[in-house]
């Protein structure tokens, strides 16, 4: 059971950080990047999104800090190769924590999670280990959307299961199922302060299918965007749709505004 409670204001703040991760990517990964909310950039996050063995690291998010508070923001899927990997549905043993099996595409993405655009740079979990080693970090929040939600989930269990930070807080939007029953149970025990915001119309939240052995982690926060946005698969999945459903002052994507 969660040790804390779901906070709309916290969800909205973290959602803005994930939107900033998208902006970082669409802007072409500029050398100068300032996180929102007065936070300072610690490092960007990169991952290899190519399945054929050819290195092609792209920026997926960032780690930011403000005093004792650290936020990790991870964007969702962009591009055909990422979508292909999203939906392989092949389970593999999760290599970083004894926690059952996870979907292969998500696991491969996570295995390439580094702080630079090649595999010689530190892994993201190791960067967090260094950041938290001095004992000055009091809160660690991890947030993601779509594929970024799966990656946030894997990062959180790696962090908690390997003694990097005992009690990360996780907010995900439009998360797919990440692993099997053993994984979900282990995750829920290690990372109880997790809130998985799920739009009832978003197909991604129903994948990979349970008949393939996949189980969602806790704790679901259901929302319904029926009266908010155009009724399309894309609009139901957009991060701005999620945030607008939580708070109507957040603008929808222009293509999703109802006529």
Task: Give the location of each predicted region.
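Gly/Ala-rich beta-loop-alpha elbow adjacent to hydrolase catalytic centers
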Residues: 144-148, 152
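N-terminal low-complexity, Ser/Thr- and acidic-residue-enriched intrinsically disordered segments
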Residues: 1-66
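Active-site signature of alpha/beta-hydrolase-fold catalytic machinery across serine-
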Residues: 154-158
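The feature captures the conserved acid-bearing segment of alpha/beta-hydrolase catalytic domains
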Residues: 163-248
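Long, charge-rich alpha-helical interaction segments
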Residues: 246-248, 253-259
């Amino acid at each position: 059971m969660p040790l804390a409670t779901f906070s709309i204001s916290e969800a909205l703040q973290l959602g803005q950080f994930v939107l900033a991760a998208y902006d970082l990517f669409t802007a072409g990964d500029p050398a100068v990047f300032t996180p929102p909310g007065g936070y300072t950039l610690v490092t960007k996050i990169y991952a290899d999104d190519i399945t054929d063995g050819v290195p092609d690291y792209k920026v997926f998010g960032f780690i930011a800090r403000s005093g004792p508070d650290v936020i990790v923001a991870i964007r969702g899927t962009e591009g055909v190769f990422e979508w292909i990997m999203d939906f392989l549905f092949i389970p593999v043993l999760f290599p970083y924590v004894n926690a059952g099996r996870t979907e292969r595409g998500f696991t491969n993405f996570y295995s390439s999670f580094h702080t630079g655009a090649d595999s010689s740079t530190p892994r993201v979990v190791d960067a967090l280990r260094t950041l938290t080693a001095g004992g000055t970090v009091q809160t660690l929040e991890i947030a993601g959307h779509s594929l970024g939600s799966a990656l946030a989930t894997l990062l959180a269990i790696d962090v908690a299961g390997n003694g990097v930070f005992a009690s990360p807080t996780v907010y995900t939007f439009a998360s797919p199922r990440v692993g099997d029953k053993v994984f979900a149970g282990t995750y829920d025990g290690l990372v109880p302060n997790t809130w998985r915001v799920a739009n009832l119309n978003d197909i991604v939240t129903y994948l990979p299918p349970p008949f393939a052995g996949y189980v969602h982690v806790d704790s679901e926060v259901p929302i319904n965007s029926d009266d908010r946005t155009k009724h399309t698969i894309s609009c139901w999945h957009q991060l701005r749709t999620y945030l607008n459903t939580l708070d109507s002052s957040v603008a929808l994507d222009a293509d999703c505004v109802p006529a």
